[in-house]
Design a protein with these regions (language model features):
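Long, compositionally biased stretches
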Residues: 198-218
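Non-catalytic alpha/beta scaffold blocks inside enzyme catalytic domains
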Residues: 1-203
């Protein structure tokens, strides 16, 4: 829950703490730059050298030096009409801290793309639904809580070229006039390895207030 890590850190800063995530893909997502203040590989977005490294890898002239929006920020912006579109993949609105607000955000957003394996609340409200294959139908890599890589075991090899999230994002990028160069899992994995290990600074621990849960529905 939000605030747990801050509470542990406040109790005793000398204690070594390890985070074992609930979902298999969370460590890899953070390493890929999921958090609004991070670039891939744990590079901080306001670090000039980090931005130069990533801009060079992506073939970009420059990158913004301000953090992006987290999930709550994106949903709030969508509710306020400040986002033109949302691309939502594998998110259950009922799992969000504010399910009602999340539903309002999706319903109020001008254009919603749902990338899904199965029917969901988001796909029911989406303008475009792009189905993707199951986990066991495509290759890939997970990082465990110790950052050790583990390959995904492909069980169903029937589709020769499964429509996975990589292909969907590459296609969307192409339609928007940008060439990602990441049309396959192998290309994405190579791009990740080519970035190398970040040798610069890392973000400092900031305090996060605890989440006050909503009253249960009766």
């Amino acid at each position: 829950r939000p605030g747990t890590l801050s509470a542990i850190n406040d109790l005793d800063s000398t204690v070594r703490v390890a985070w074992v995530p609930r979902r298999a893909g969370e460590i890899g997502a953070i390493e890929a730059g999921l958090l609004p203040q991070l670039l891939p590989g744990g590079r901080f977005v306001d670090d000039a050298k980090a931005r130069i490294d990533i801009a060079a890898a992506w073939g970009a002239t420059n990158l913004p030096n301000q953090p992006g929006l987290d999930a709550d920020g994106m949903l709030a912006a969508a509710r306020a009409g400040q986002l033109d579109a949302l691309v939502v993949s594998g998110v259950e609105l009922a799992d969000m801290p504010d399910p009602t607000g999340a539903r309002e955000a999706v319903e109020n957003c001008g254009f919603v793309v749902s990338v899904e394996q199965r029917f969901s609340e988001v796909s029911a409200r989406a303008d475009v639904v792009l189905p993707v294959c199951l986990l066991e139908e495509t290759s890939g890599t997970f990082l465990d809580w110790e950052h050790r890589p583990g390959r995904v075991r492909v069980v169903n090899k029937q589709p020769a070229t499964p429509m996975n999230e990589i292909r969907v994002l590459d296609a969307l990028s192409a339609q928007m006039g940008s060439v990602s160069g990441l049309a396959t899992v192998a290309q994405a994995h190579k791009a990740w390895k080519d970035l190398g290990q970040w040798q610069g600074g890392h973000p400092k621990m900031e305090s996060t207030p605890p989440l006050v849960p909503q009253a249960p529905m009766v």
